[in-house]
């Protein structure tokens, strides 16, 4: 059976610039899963829309008949993966440091950040609760214990609201997929697939 994993980087990142994504790809290869790096043009337009990032991902996404397909996203890439899951219908989803920019998160963010986000990301007010209710895909959540509180709260809330979800906390890790502690947690999650 063919096994494929799509890897969506964080905002402004790429496997060409951040080596952590290539290490993640190797973890998939060790499990007999073919990694596919997804390049997102984060600066394609201004103001930005998450729906544009989802469309870019779905343009390269393929699910061969009978194949197991996994989607791993980091930060904004995790949000892109989450927003695309009902259309992509993967075998499992791995959300690394899911961004806390859903409607339910705004009350815990600084007003200046919310103002910037709403100015630069139009039509990107998504309700996590409404989307989570539609998701039946097994979801692995990863977050570093040294990440900002908003990220930790978003991921812990996701664990409660997603039916078939598993939470792994990377001890000593910040919001950096290339950090050794973060990568070790990603490796452990991938080893379960």
Indicate residue ranges for each PLM-predicted region.
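Gly/Ala-rich beta-loop-alpha elbow adjacent to hydrolase catalytic centers
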Residues: 72-81
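Catalytic histidine-centered segment of alpha/beta-hydrolase-like enzymes
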Residues: 47-48, 173-184
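Active-site nucleophile loop of the alpha/beta-hydrolase fold
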Residues: 94-104
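Alpha/beta-hydrolase active-site loop
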Residues: 20, 45-64
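Conserved alpha/beta-hydrolase "acid-adjacent" motif
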Residues: 148-154, 178
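Short beta-strand/loop motif that positions the catalytic acidic residue
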Residues: 134-136, 141-143
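Short, surface-exposed "cap/lid" segments of acyl-processing enzymes
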Residues: 1-42
């Amino acid at each position: 059976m063919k096994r494929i994993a799509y890897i969506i980087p964080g905002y402004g990142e790429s496997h060409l610039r951040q080596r952590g994504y290539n290490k993640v790809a190797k973890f998939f290869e060790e499990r007999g899963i073919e990694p596919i790096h997804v390049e997102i043009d984060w600066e394609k337009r201004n103001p930005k829309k998450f729906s544009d990032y989802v469309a870019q991902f779905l343009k390269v996404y393929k699910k061969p008949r009978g194949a197991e397909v996994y989607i791993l996203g980091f930060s904004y890439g995790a949000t892109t993966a989450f927003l695309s899951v009902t259309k992509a219908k993967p075998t499992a989803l791995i959300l690394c440091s899911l961004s806390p920019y859903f409607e339910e998160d705004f009350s815990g963010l600084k007003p200046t950040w919310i103002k910037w986000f709403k100015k630069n990301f139009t039509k990107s007010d998504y309700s996590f609760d409404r989307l989570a209710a539609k998701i039946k895909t097994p979801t692995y959540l990863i977050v570093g214990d040294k990440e900002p509180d908003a990220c930790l709260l978003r991921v812990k809330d996701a664990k409660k609201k997603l039916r078939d979800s598993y939470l792994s906390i990377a001890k000593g890790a910040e919001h950096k997929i290339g950090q050794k502690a973060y990568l070790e947690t990603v490796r452990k999650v991938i080893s379960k697939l």
